Amino acid sequence: KIDSATNEKRMADLISKDQLKLVFATAKQENIDKYFAPLNAALAHYSINSPLRICHFIAQVAQESGCFRYNEEIWPNPTLDANGVATKGSSWQLRYEGNTGLGNTHSGDGYRFRGRGLIQLTGRANYEKYGAYLKRDLTSGTNPDLVAQPDLAVDAAGWYWSTRDLNSYADKDDVLSITKRI
């Protein structure tokens, strides 16, 4: 198949725009269009390539992204101090700040490494690991924001899915185990 946007040959799509529109019924067409190619690339790259795997992955993406409405954590904007740290008692600070299970060991990590991407990559440790996989710095400056851009938002979801071996749970049609791991 020739991709008309890039004029390059690529594999047949694993999911069509019409299928996405059925699942993401409330999604704007511009968001379907924006995520369509990166989504098919991630499905192929991360071997999310059987009907059960695709169904489970797409269902999780639909839930976590609000049907492509959100590619970043949607809690209300926190009040930040002069160092960019969520103020004590804010929802960001209470939920993520100092969460060593997520690798949030520096002041401000809770807000800085909040969920981004279509399944909400969260925590310094996940940003570091995903960045190492890409051979790209995702932790300095404004670089964490890159994970909210369409290509990385989808790829981060595929990477997270793959590194948690979620295909094996999808193959068993085990939605509860998948959901717990996401």
Identify what each model region corresponds to.
Residues 1-10:
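Short, Lys/Arg-enriched N-terminal segments with co-localized hydrophobic residues
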Residues 152-154, 163-170:
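Proteins synthesized as precursors that undergo proteolytic processing into mature forms
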Residues 51-65:
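Active-site-adjacent structural elements in enzyme catalytic domains
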Residues 44-49, 139-148, 170-173:
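Short, mixed-charge amphipathic alpha-helical segments
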Residues 22-55, 182:
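N-terminal carbohydrate-binding/catalytic regions of secreted carbohydrate-active enzymes
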Residues 10-31, 38, 62-160:
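Peptidoglycan-targeting cell-wall enzymes and recognition modules
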Residues 40, 58, 157-158, 179:
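Non-transmembrane alpha-helical segments in soluble domains
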Residues 61-64, 170-182:
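Acidic helix/loop microenvironments that form the catalytic cleft of cell-wall polysaccharide enzymes
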